[in-house]
């Protein structure tokens, strides 16, 4: 269990770069499920993610403008810096992926691809529109819109799941969603999470100053709304990242809507408690909180290495980078980046969070005594944390998708035995004829893995 290396489930890492052909990379977790399902909830997830991204980004920009307008230039500069720099990084990555797709679109005239589904379609979006989206910091919306479009085309198609065109729609939707959720995931922890500490500290200071008068400036309400949107954004990004990975795995069961809601509630409550704890550390220690964060990263890195060590063939540098990224994500919320049991990983991570929360609210009470409503905060924050943990336990005990998978496994086994018993009663000549027909179909129709390798837009 300890120091055992696991496969990464955050990134789709190539097995062999020599297999790349016209932009197609065979990746470890790219598998097409045997049963293709796109629910209305999946389409809702795409739309909700687009709305939350836009609201989160522009609310941060609006808060920065409010601060500049009121003459609080330092506060405005901090909010604007932590909003724009991560957004620029994410949109540069998005632009690189778009250009990569554009390059592979131009290479589709390969003789092997003549007459395929791909050549009958125009490019999804023009290069000019791609650049415009990224300039206005809306690059990630392209991938969500693409996933939403192909998901809608899949649901509109009334043909059987074995239909080649319908499977293409599904694979394109999954590919676009994978890119979108990965961008959104990193955007959440590059931009939204640091913004929560910055804006939370600013809001706490001004709340303390205006509490005696009882009259709060209007921008403080907007800042509270912006903080709420950021927490929603982070919580939802973790949920959809998990859901996206499960959708493409034939060995995994996809997340149902009520399971996603439980995951979201658990994440929202624990992240809310964690952010309030970090803001309290900032109010208490100021700039010296950097040393506490550094200490937390060291502790986190140790237990991540012990419990979530990754194995990526011929990619030792990527292993180290992913471990470091995972440790930084743990500053805000535990995240399971590796395959395997999550019990001990979350137990250790949430124990560290609980100890830090108790230190700031119970062992060091004197400096925070002057803060308004501090007694309610000391009770409310741990209560919020434990409610989130309780929802997590309910989720894993009764509603985790693997429980449905375990229940379905015996039925699958019984069906296989039934098929075998039925075949025993079929004449051998009929079986040979069926096998001959199946052999002809295998030579005329591409297999699932071959159709995946024909997919032209997998680039990361």
UniProtKB/Swiss-Prot annotation:
GO cellular component term of the entry, any: plasma membrane
A Gene Ontology biological process term: phosphatidylserine exposure on apoptotic cell surface
InterPro entries the record matches: XK-rel (IPR018629), XK-related_scramblase (IPR050895)
Compartments where found: Cell membrane
PTMs per UniProt: Cleavage by ced-3 activates ced-8 function in promoting phosphatidylserine exposure at the surface of apoptotic cells.
The keyword DNA-binding appears for this protein: no
Transmembrane feature ranges: 46-66, 78-98, 124-144, 220-240, 275-295, 321-341, 354-374, 379-399
Keyword annotations from UniProtKB, A to Z: Apoptosis, Cell membrane, Membrane, Transmembrane, Transmembrane helix
Record site: Cleavage: 21-22
Any one GO molecular function term: phospholipid scramblase activity
Function: Acts downstream of ced-9 and caspase ced-3 to promote phosphatidylserine exposure on apoptotic cell surface, possibly by mediating phospholipid scrambling. Phosphatidylserine is a specific marker only present at the surface of apoptotic cells and acts as a specific signal for engulfment. Regulates apoptosis kinetics during embryonic development. Not required for engulfment of germ cell corpses.
Family to which this protein belongs: Belongs to the XK family.
Protein name: Cell death abnormality protein 8
Source organism: Caenorhabditis briggsae
């Amino acid at each position: 269990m300890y120091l055992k290396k696991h496969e990464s489930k955050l990134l789709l890492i190539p097995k062999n770069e020599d297999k790349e052909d016209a932009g197609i990379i065979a990746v470890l977790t790219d598998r097409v499920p045997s049963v293709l399902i796109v629910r209305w909830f999946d389409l809702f997830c795409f739309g909700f993610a687009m709305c939350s991204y836009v609201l989160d980004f522009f609310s941060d920009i609006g808060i920065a403008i409010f601060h500049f307008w009121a003459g609080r230039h330092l506060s405005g500069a901090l909010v604007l810096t932590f909003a724009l720099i991560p957004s620029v990084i994410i949109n540069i990555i998005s632009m690189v992926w778009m250009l990569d797709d554009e390059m592979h679109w131009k290479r589709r005239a390969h003789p092997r691809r003549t007459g395929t589904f791909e050549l009958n379609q125009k490019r999804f979006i023009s290069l000019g529109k791609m650049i415009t989206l990224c300039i206005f910091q809306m690059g990630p919306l392209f991938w969500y819109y693409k996933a939403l479009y192909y998901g809608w085309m899949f649901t509109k198609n009334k043909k059987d799941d074995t239909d080649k065109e319908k499977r293409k729609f599904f694979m394109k939707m999954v590919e676009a969603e994978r890119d979108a959720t990965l961008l959104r995931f990193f955007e959440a922890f590059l931009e939204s999470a640091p913004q929560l500490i910055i804006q939370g500290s600013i809001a706490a200071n001004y709340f303390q100053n205006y509490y005696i008068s009882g009259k709060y400036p209007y921008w403080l309400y907007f800042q509270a709304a912006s903080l709420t949107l950021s927490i929603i954004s982070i919580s939802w990004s973790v949920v959809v990242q998990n859901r996206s990975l499960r959708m493409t795995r034939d060995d995994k069961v996809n997340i149902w809507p009520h399971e996603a809601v439980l995951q979201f509630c658990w994440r929202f409550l624990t992240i809310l408690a964690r952010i309030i704890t970090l803001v309290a550390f900032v109010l208490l220690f100021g700039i010296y909180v950097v040393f506490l964060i550094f200490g937390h990263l060291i502790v986190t890195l140790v237990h991540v290495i012990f419990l979530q060590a990754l194995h990526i063939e011929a990619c030792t540098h990527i292993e180290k980078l992913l471990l470091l990224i995972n440790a930084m994500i743990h500053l805000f919320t535990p995240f399971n980046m590796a395959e395997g049991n999550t019990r001990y990983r979350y137990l250790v991570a949430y124990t560290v969070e609980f100890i830090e929360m108790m230190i700031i609210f119970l062992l060091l009470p004197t400096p925070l005594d002057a803060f308004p409503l501090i007694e309610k905060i000391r009770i409310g924050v741990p209560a919020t944390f434990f409610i989130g943990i309780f929802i997590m336990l309910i989720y894993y005990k009764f509603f985790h998708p693997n429980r449905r998978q375990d229940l379905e496994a015996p039925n699958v086994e019984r069906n296989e035995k039934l098929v075998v018993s039925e075949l025993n009663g079929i004449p051998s000549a009929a079986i040979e004829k069926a096998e001959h027909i199946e052999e002809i179909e295998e030579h005329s129709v591409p297999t699932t893995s071959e159709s995946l390798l024909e997919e032209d837009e997998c680039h990361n």
